[in-house]
Amino acid sequence: VLRKTIQEQESPELYTNLPGTDTLLPHYLKLLIPQYGKTILIKHLIHFQTNASYAYENLETLHQIIPLCFSAGINYIPFYYYSKLSRNDRPNLLYPFYIITEKYVLQLASDLSKGILHSDPAILQEYTKEFQNCLEHSSPLLQQSKNLDEALQLYMTSFDTIQDITSLDATPCDSDFMDNEYFFDRVKEHSPEYAPFMNAYKSFLNVINQANRNDFFTINGFQKYCEYGISSGTSSIVIPKFSPEERITSLKYFLEHFSNENHHMLNSTFSYPDSLYIELRNNHSLFLINLADKANISFIIIQESSICNAFSEFFQLLADSEYITPENQTRTLIQKYIQQLKQLTFGITP
């Protein structure tokens, strides 16, 4: 059904209520999308657990669907509703899952091992109509964008309500490396096309600086910045590469404002991709940003309570874990790189 839909339709669409925890849909999309070079629209109706004992299923769902959001060739729009049904209840349900396309409805058994295929236009019309009704009684799971300008606008939404921010990135936050004016000067120099955003971004940064912040970054990402001038997050969009002089200035600023209560360097045993940025605001808004370069950005906002609570608990555990580099070691490493960069730039020996 998937192959025929992608192969035959100019703008293929697919509607489904397959379990969010199941790997079936991501697996076949990964195989088929590259073969045909088309973009498929997928609307996915997912049930989320209300029972806290099964909340891990909600996280499993997130684990399966986020790669779909980040994938080229897939316009993936998930919706959710709450249900007390668990996977233990599925064997008692009669063909509870379905896939709807322009030409087919495929009903699937609870274990997805067998199905009933319909091609009658009347059945297709009825299923499509009822699916739309279901969407009206559900909620979008996330907001997303793959357009840089739109992503920046979304990122700065409702920033005046921010009180607490916890983030995880490969490198420290821009505002930890430099004050606002220094950042804006670098933007004007390296990427003047983003100057129109700077007034709004300045107001945003002022709020960020007043919030209670808890930032995690990796030692591998930090070393990459110090040695090659390659940052992550917003600065990597507008400042392609920091010069040795800029790195010295930013590291001095970071060392001066460093606090082990708010800044946590994760040691080399913590594996984390350079392109991913995670931010939790006020414990009820989760931002996931995958930024390969200016042309390849995936931006997601999730405001579902069980997922946000799970990330809040994760960050609390991470702060007290064996992954945290002690403050004295972090300061020593920063000072070491300042001296190395001075020697490289000005010929100053330690």
PLM segments and residue spans:
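Short, charged alpha-helical segments
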Residues: 329-332
